[in-house]
Each structure stands twice: as C-alpha cells, then as structure tokens.
Swiss-Prot record:
One term of GO molecular function: tRNA binding
Species of origin: Shewanella sp. (strain W3-18-1)
Annotated cofactor note: Binds 1 zinc ion per subunit.
Primary location: cytoplasm
Locus of motif 'KMSKS' region: 236-240
The protein's name in its UniProt record: Glutamate--tRNA ligase
Binding site for ATP: K239
Pfam families: Anticodon_2, tRNA-synt_1c
Gene name in the database record: gltX
Gene3D superfamilies in UniProt: 1.10.10.350, HUPs
GO CC terms, sorted: cytosol
Amino acid sequence: MTTKTRFAPSPTGFLHVGGARTALYSWLQARANNGEFVLRIEDTDIERSTQAACDAILEGMNWLGLTWDEGPYYQTKRFDRYNEIIAQMLEKGTAYKCYCSRERIDALRESQAANGEAQKYDGCCRDLPARDTDEPFVVRFKNPIGGSVVFDDHVRGRIEFSNDALDDLIIARTDGVPTYNFCVVVDDWDMGITCVVRGEDHINNTPRQINILKALGAPIPEYAHVSMILGDDGAKLSKRHGAVSVMQYRDDGYLPEALLNYLVRLGWSHGDQEVFSLEEMKQYFKLDDINKAPSAFNTDKLVWLNQHYIKTLDPEYVATHLQWHMDDQKIDTSNGPALAEVVTALAERAKTLKELAASSRYFYEDFADFDAEQAKKHLRGVALEPLQLVQQKLAALTEWTVEAIHQAIEQTATELDVGMGKVGMPLRVSVTGAGQSPGLDITLFLIGRSRSEQRISKAIEFVADRINS
C-alpha cells in the first residue's frame, strides 16, 4: 500500500513554526517511504478563513521547498460531497437530526457542571422517530455506546478512549455547513490518506474520527501526534520566543535549509547528528523516532545552523536567496560584483542573509561619509603617506587581480617599514567607509579598480584636510 500523508492547515493565520514542523514531518514520512504528500486547506471556518492567510501558507510551503503531489484541496469546494455522505448516514441510521434548542443545551451543560459530571450531549433526539417539521436542527453522529476506541500512535504508543466519554458529535450545523471533524474524516477517506501526522492538540478528535470512519466502512489511517513546541523558558511558544510566520524567518535572513534542519531536530533525532541535508532527512526519518516530550525553541541554535549553511552551501544558490534581501534593502546589484562572489567573501562573518546584505552595500554603492569613529582612529595624519604610496602601487598594476592587489599592499608596508595594520586599516576605512571587511585584496578586487581609486583619493583628501585644519 502506498504511503500517503497530508498537511491540512486552517487559513486563519500565517504558517508558524509549529505548523511548519508538522508539515515537514508529514512530508518526510511520505518521501521516506516513496509515498505521496497532499496539501489540503481546511477552510470550513468561513468567518475566520482569509485568502491572505491561504496565500501565506502556500508561500511558506514553497519557500521551504515542501512540494506536494496533490492539491491544494479546499474543503469549501467539497460541501456537496460532505452533504452526500451526511444524507447516506441519515438514511442508514448512523446519524440523526437533533432539534434541541440552544437554551436546552446550555441548561443541560449547566446542570452537568453543577453535578460535577462531564459536559456532553445526552442523546435526547437520538432515537426519536423522523418528523416533518420546519424546526431548525443539527445533524449528529450516532456514536457507539459502550466499548472503547483504541489506536497505536507512532509517537505516544497505545491510546484508548471509552465510547461512553464521547458524545454524539455534531457533523452539520443548523445552517447546513458540515463541521471540521466530519470534513476531515471524509477528506482522509476520499484522498486515501494512510498516515495522519498532526499536533497533540488533535488527540481528543481522533476517537471521534475513527468511529465515523468505522461507520462509513472506511479504512483507519495510522496516527502520529507530535508534542508542542515550548519556548526556552518552558512556557508555551509565543511571539516573544519565535512563534512567528515562516516567512518572517525569510525576512530576517534565514535560509530554508537552516529552518528545516532546525525544525526536524525539534523532537526527532538520528544518533548525535545535528546537521541534516534534506536527502539525509528523507533517508533517516522514522515517525517512531519522534520524542513525545515537548521541545524547546532555541534561537541561538537556529542562528548557528544558519551560519553553517551560509558558509557551506553553493554560493550561487545562497546568492539567489541573498538577492531578495538586496532588493528589500534597495541595493542595486546591477553595478557591482556577482553576488556569489560577495557571498564567498562575506560568508565567514555572516549570521544571517539580512546582515550579509547590509554589510555588502559598499560593494555596490558609494558612501557619503566615513564612519566617524573609524575615521578618527585610522584616517589620521600618519595615514597620509601609506595611503598615497598604496594608491601609486595600485595605479601601476597592469592587472586588477587579488594576487596583484595583495602584493601592492605588502610592498607598501615593506617600503615604509611598517606593520600591515598601518597600511591595511587606513586602506580598509578608505574603501569601505567602515572598519570591517574581508581580506583587503578580495575587498578591493570586488569593489573594482575605478571605485577603489576614487575612494582612496577621497580618503587622502580627508586626511589632508584634517592635517590642515
């Protein structure tokens, strides 16, 4: 039997890290078993569902590279199918119309609460004969009486619910709209889902859904209910911990590989290995290896992984993601070095692509002023001679290469009998406007000959004015 999994978010908000991890685990279960992955949008909550949220979910999935084989399916486009099944259940007697008023239901719950009883529907309309009336009604599933529902969860082991603890679930509201728990069952059946991976908050839905599947004569899928993600302080994950949109991580400069690697390790492990490519995840992933204990979100670990991937992935690939940040920061990359070369030069220092973009601006744009602190420290009178001599050496070069630039800087220090820092730091501030950059040879090479010479001339003029003031 072909493994078939699904990710079924509700479009009431963005795709957050918890949802992204569930999607990843479900995707990996399909890919690890040569199966199929279905994307389904559960938009039956019409009042809260928005197209913007739906678009954000699709954008997040695409950015992460979690491609789907079927879908996206939308529940609101399947109402005819749900109503068809409800009609069949009413005819077979596995569902019934309930005419109880809201007032009666509220009074029942208040009475049960006062008596310390579980609050559930009492089956008042369960065995009433059919009646011809215009009274409003809901449709309820006729849950089995007695016995229990047992299933083996890949994460949590054997789970059992008594049927007596379950009430007769509403499967269609008074307006005729089918309910979430019912739509999920029909969808999983129709789409041939063999394994359901979802959050632990759905555990209580599972026995109800299994009972409906049994009533329909449908196969029961496997289940894996993953634990919640906590903040590093042990509290439920919130925005202050990192419970933000997946696309916010893109905006903050993270690579999708880093976020995927981080998310897969939030509850799953393979020995002591920390860094996993997608291919390795597909090779090693097993649902039974997911830990049922909650996982703590640690931003420092995510940053470490991001640094790793910026340094080790193909610079051409990293450059495709960096381009978004260059555009976002309004840096025109058409007049300057190839972005992949900038990635190679700056990757060792960069924590995020957002930082990398900001620190690469001087490769593409001239700066109005030198950093005041760095200029005060390094563009002093003693810097005039080194800057003038290195300018002459660079102007005399027949080729503008990293090796030739390096020799020109070294020769300047040798002829002046000073340390490299006496030449290097004034030169660095001259061409970058600041005090940090990669090696000066590669920095000048990437800035380009014309720009470098113009900036050194500007620095010499700055130092001369300072001497004369």
